[in-house]
Amino acid sequence: MSDKFQLLLQQIGMPLDARQSGAFSTATIEKVVLHKVSKLWEFTFRFETPLPLMDYQLFKARLATEFEKVGNKIQFSIVSDAEAFEAGLVEAYYPEAFTEDLCQSAGFKALFQPLEVAYRDGVLWIKGPETIDTDHFRKNHLPNLVEQYKRFGFGNLAVDIQVCQEMTQQQAEIFHAQNAEIYQQANEENLAALEQLAQMAPPPEAAQPFVPEYKKNRPAKVNIEKAEITPMIEVDSEENRIVFEGLVFEVEQKTTKTGRVIINFKMTDYTSSFTLQKWAKNEEEAQKFDMVKKGNWLRVRGNVETNNFTRDLTMNVQEVQEVKKEIRKDLMPEGEKRVEFHAHTNMSTMDALPAVEDLVARAAAWGHKAVAITDHGNVQSFPHGYHAARKAGIKPLFGMEANIVEDSVPIAYNEADVVLSDATYVVFDVETTGLSAVNNALIQIAASKMHKGNIIAEFDEFIDPGHPLSQFTTDLTGITDEHVRGSKPLEQVLREFQDFCQDSVMVAHNATFDVGFMNVNYERAGLPIISQPVIDTLEFARNLYPDFKRHGLGPLTKRFGVALEHHHMANYDAEATGRLLFIFLKDALEKHNLTNLNQLNTELIAEDSYKKARVKHATLYVINQVGLKNMFKLVSLSNTKYFEGVPRIPRTVLNAHREGLILGTACQEGEVFDDLLSKGIDEAVKTAAYYDFIEVMPPALYAPMIAKEQFKDMAEIEETIKQLIEVGRRAGLPVLATGNVHYIDPEEEIYREIIVRALGQGAPINWTIGNGENAQPAPLPKAHFRTTSEMLDEFAFLGESLAREIVITNPNAMLDRFEDVQVVKTDLYTPYIEKAEETVAELTYQKAFEIYGNPLPDIIDLRIEKELTSILGNGFAVIYLASQMLVHRSNERGYLVGSRGSVGSSFVATMIGITEVNPMPPHYVCPNCQHSEFITDGSYGSGFDLPDKDCEKCGTKYKKDGQDIPFETFLGFDGDKVPDIDLNFSGDDQPSAHLDVRDIFGEENAFRAGTVGTVAAKTAYGFVRGYERDYGKFYRDVEVERLAAGAAGVKRTTGQHPGGIIVFPDYMDVYDFTPVQYPADDVTASWQTTHFNFHDIDENVLKLDILGHDDPTMVRKLQDLSGIDPQTIPADDKGVMALFSGTEILGVTPEQIGTPTGMLGIPEFGTNFVRGMVEETKPTTFSELLQLSGLSHGTDVWLGNAQDLIKAGIANLSTVIGCRDDIMVYLMHAGLPPKMAFNIMERVRKGLWLKISEEERNGYIQAMKDNKVPDWYIESCGKIKYMFPKAHAAAYVMMALRVAYFKVHHPLYYYCAYFSIRAKAFDLATMSGGLERVKAKMEEIALKKKNNEASNVEQDLYTTLELVNEMLERGFKFGKLDLYKSHATDFLIEEDTLIPPFVAMDGLGENVAKQVVAARAEGEFLSKTELRKRGGLSGTLVEKMDEMGILGKMPEDNQLSLFDDLF
């Protein structure tokens, strides 16, 4: 695009000498994007090298000037081919960076622009003082500076900061000058001086600059109570003495090292939002501002200034006052309030906002007796709505806005015995001023009379509607006022057309519309409606060609080569439809032997024609328990068997499950409303007979239909509402005024706007007006939750009496039909396994006797008795037995199963084989004579740490076990908590384990645990930015945050838990608990899921967590390679423990592998974070490893807590709080009662320590102090937010140590298994290129990581290369991919070398890899062509193999294969 670039240079007026210079003469336009709404042009230019700074500045200025002249904005970036840069050029660009938007943060600019820079060794170094927060710079500003240099054309430039000692004092003074109070004082002094100067100065002669109204006449001192409140949207620059009033939606309070308190908060007045800051001298002064809380309305006074470290304006607050701002209230008297029968929650996919809890709470706050939940096609809000309504004390009305379809849509109407080949057809089309036959007018009727494929007569008449045509109508149809002016009267045209159609079969594309329009107009004219047969070519095509994606007239004419010059002009459409008709008739005869019109409906309509039927909305409501189950069945069927684009309910299916349900007519998408507009009131009355009540909505909810010209004005909408009420009267049905609620308060409308627009054009609820580039989004209705008074005001045009009847009387009367319904059950319903209780007890004692002897030691006997009493007494035996059966089956297939969560706290689970973790106190047990010795004084944290010892009775070496975990941490102190047994199966075996559940319990009783995916915060942020871009909006950052928060949480999709399976008892039905569906509406999925989020029912049914995990797969691979049984590997191997304190055991130095310990690639301990913890703590025992595991998985357990205690020497790794169970055990050893120790553990592990009452907390603290628990321990408890269970840590550490054992003692097996199973990214050329090449690649990626430029693939590759480097340093080799040796998916060992598999090659998938191996087995590849054909490899992959030296001297072709091709 160099020619286009030169043309651009001419257009922007670049001087000729510049255009012909070396830099500009070879440049090109690489990419250009135009954002039409915001008129923003984004260019990417390619230059050989970055431009000289003066050339860049000239180019930038000319672009901006010329584009602004025509009302456009421009952004551009430069891509350069250069890899090395001149130091002077790089440094010269540094000040220029601060003129660009990316580096405009005032604080960043003020502090960093004056600093000196130096470019050396590929890095631009910024010389800064010690007082600069380098971490803050690298996190918040460095990425922007790097990106700006990239846009200048310095693509691979790195930037960093270098501390410069001599600048410290100067920079410190600048920092102190930024104290908020000094700023405020300086602003006041400056303002006073300016005012004094203004009084002394003569009146100005020149015109004064524009001053916004809100800034005029502002007094020097502002009384916050009397001050004029400034709308936030009007403040776009720095300004003093501003007063805002708004809602606080975020608060953060920080205490500085000097004790000062900074209160940062964000407010909105719904015109925009602002960030505010208040400084307090100390905590005591900060308490004066405790009204600054989320959800409070405040009036604030202060100065608006540019924040030093953000790019937004911030108010430095001087005064705060709380404002009483009450939510809207329903002020109608008790007994005279409405009930909302049509409300959506955030479970209406990408359409509505309120959480059901908020909807219910608002209805209750208003004093409404009930509120309905009617989400689109689902009932996922039912469980939360049920609980919320019970809590609020109002009646929940459980409903759904369903998509109703006819089981089959006729191809032919008014059927008759007509031979298709002999018939005469009138193929007609009408053009209208809108979609409503009642409210819009006919403006053209055209038809072609055809016989045996030939046109024998034509009809074409325009009709004057009596008013000018709208631009919308003209744009759509091409018909202008000139076409219709002076045309025949409508009645005359209708009579002539009826005569034209005599003795013919009528044909139209989408005939229901055309016939409906004609019949309404015939009736008005007093003429008979159409009675002759009618064929609908739309339905004809859908059934004849079901594989076509589109069946509109345009796509069909293109597919069959039929001319259609002016689509949407009736005469052209009619002729094209006629041509298609005879193609269809010919195919119907040849493919289906259809000869008679009567056969079209009986023999051609497909069983699944409901998939193409037009969807009509209806509201379904549950009135009793039978209805709830029927609702669940309908939701299930519509989301599985009848799903097509949306959940569909065929009418016959609805009829079969209608007991216990009542039906409302829904919104304008309902069939009664549609029939009223398209067929008239008589047809609407007939249709209404199917329903139980008529819905009418406020005129404002129908108002968007005016924009689509379905209504002329609000008066026409009001008339239609009156007709709907008349339909109800004539049908004998009550009429209810409903609000079609999509958000609660009017100001939330913008959130829905953002969500709906994010769907893009073409989404049903985001329909547009106009076509192509002229298409504009149609307005959305005002769909907030209305009070009774607001609703009465909406219907005031009906008169007070009728308005009260439909708004108040009828909805309240309808309530009497609703019984109380239980959506969520209160009990646990486990599946039935015969003799489960006896089997669990038998297996437990059998294993216990085998290990500990008979009779059992008292400590074992008492523990088993305690656990079995709880397990059997509460009906949990079947859960234990089911888990045991699943683990046993996987073990039989050769895989270990790791446990997760707290199941390892149960000794019964250990004995029956569910978990390897033994929760008894540390102990010895003799494998020969079963003698045992238990250590119960807390002196050891794990039995694996006990010193080796021989049995005192028989001399056999003792086994050591026991992790000292109380049973209470699994099933609660009273043992009645439903067990949640999570299991880690091998990822390879997980599918088989899932199928085992079906085999054990039956396919009809096992479903994947369903989840609901909602719009995440980051996604919502993207939606807001997209809305801002596409619709020409400009928001400050804090307003984007507010809008994103409002748009987040809306349902976007559904899914499934990665390993969760819900089992329903066979003595009940799944529909007693939940509907079912497919995950993400994927009807090809092999498993159905629960419709409800599994958390909503996990207290009522059995949930099995059958997760896939790499550890069991890795251990199985190591076992296969070595023949070593992993269960025989000791947990206290000295060589393995040496990994945690150094690298010597690996035979390498820390410098060789880049880390001081041997943790690379060890599960649980191999991440950068945990490696750092290992380096700090240097664990030497199993119990310390448990501590590390707990510390690394908890929240606020290590950072700012245990880490500080260890550094200060107050505690050590063994004594800090690591795992949740340790708290209970430690406190019991200290002397606290078990119940209190348990309660303290529960409060701490859930982060509730500071949330419980002061009285309760002080009671616990006193008890701990009385038992000499140290103060640091008590303080540590208060900081914790979440804790890891010790049983989980023990299971993970045991697996990790098995893997580590092979790394130490069988390294090549370890590396083979690691690269086969755990490694995520490969670079075979680097990996097989030797140590230097590996280290160079690691350095390259490390630099990118430092500059936040490394991609996810590069970061994964770095992890792989760390292990490759370690393996090479240990003396092993990495071979090349070998065409005749490499496995498809696994690494292979050949002496001291690893041979990579085919899948390790970039772009080569598993299926192709297996095909290559299979083809290889059939014979040698004689040429590259043969390799491509037989191996299924692409030309690109073969080329890569050749470049890597894998193919040797393989020729492109071989003569034999060429000869074969010729014959």
From Swiss-Prot:
Reactions it catalyzes: DNA(n) + a 2'-deoxyribonucleoside 5'-triphosphate = DNA(n+1) + diphosphate
> What is the annotated localization of this protein?
Cytoplasm
Q: What is any one of the record's Gene Ontology cellular component terms?
A: cytoplasm
Single Gene Ontology BP annotation: DNA-templated DNA replication
Report the main location listed first in the record: cytoplasm
Pfam families hit by this protein: DNA_pol3_a_NI, DNA_pol3_a_NII, DNA_pol3_alpha, DNA_pol3_finger, HHH_6, PHP, RNase_T, tRNA_anti-codon
Q: Which UniProt keywords apply?
A: Cytoplasm, DNA replication, DNA-directed DNA polymerase, Exonuclease, Hydrolase, Nuclease, Nucleotidyltransferase, Transferase
InterPro entries linked: DNA_pol3_alpha_NTPase_dom, DNA_pol3_finger, DNA_PolC-like_N_II, DNA_PolC-type_N_I, DnaE2/DnaE/PolC, DNAPol_HHH, DnaQ, Exonuclease_RNaseT/DNA_pol3
The enzyme's E.C. designation: 2.7.7.7
Domain named Exonuclease is located at 425-581
An example of a GO molecular function for this protein is: 3'-5' exonuclease activity
Q: Which NCBIfam families match?
A: dnaq, polC_Gram_pos, PRK00448.1
Functional note: Required for replicative DNA synthesis. This DNA polymerase also exhibits 3' to 5' exonuclease activity.
Family affiliation? Belongs to the DNA polymerase type-C family. PolC subfamily.
Protein name, entry field: DNA polymerase III PolC-type
Q: Which species is listed as the source?
A: Streptococcus suis (strain 05ZYH33)
Q: Which gene encodes it?
A: polC
